[in-house]
Amino acid sequence: MATKYENVYNRFINKIKKDKNFFSYKNCTEDEVEVIIKRRCFSLLDEATILVNNEIANFEIDFTDRNDEDEAFNFDLIKIEEELIAEKMYFLYFKEEEVKVKQMQKYLGNDISMFSPAEERKTFENMLEKVESRYEKILDDYNARLRDGSGYNLTGVSEDEVSVVSSWI
């Protein structure tokens, strides 16, 4: 059974549900808003799967192996993979927001302090760093373990390192 995109979308939406900008679409019906959000989620999922694919150690997994028509991956994702992709989507979403802030800063120049004080920008930057750090932690955890959960991924680890790791287990 293939994992539906909706599983990943729901994890992503749970992360951003407090962000009114993502869900605020004036003069749109509820159905139109749902379509817009779904398109937005798909766009982020598409980019995230490509990027995550390049960052994982397990080359047998291909997150771009998907069926967009059925809105599903062509294989079953494990929970940490769903979370990894959703977290990357979350990071990409905030990177886009960062670009908007920088564009506004460039456009407004010194006047930006009237609209976005330095403290708020610093808070945003700190939040982005935390999101990236959380993603990196999930990625490291994913890369360190075998997909079936039976042990650790020791691909590319020397025999000396294996004996050190084995002594911890």
Task: List each language-model region with its residue ranges.
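Short, solvent-exposed secondary-structure capping/transition elements
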Residues: 57, 61, 94-106
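Elongated alpha-helical scaffolds
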Residues: 78-99
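Polybasic, proline/glycine-rich intrinsically disordered low-complexity segments
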Residues: 117-153
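Short linear sequence motifs
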Residues: 2-5, 35, 52, 84-87, ...
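Short, exposed interaction segments that mediate macromolecular assembly or regulatory contacts
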Residues: 69-79, 107-121
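Conserved short "hinge" loops at termini or chain/domain junctions
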Residues: 1-79, 141-144, 150-169
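Long amphipathic alpha-helical coiled-coil segments
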Residues: 101-115, 142-157
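A short, terminal or domain-edge coil/loop segment
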Residues: 83-88, 114-126, 155-169
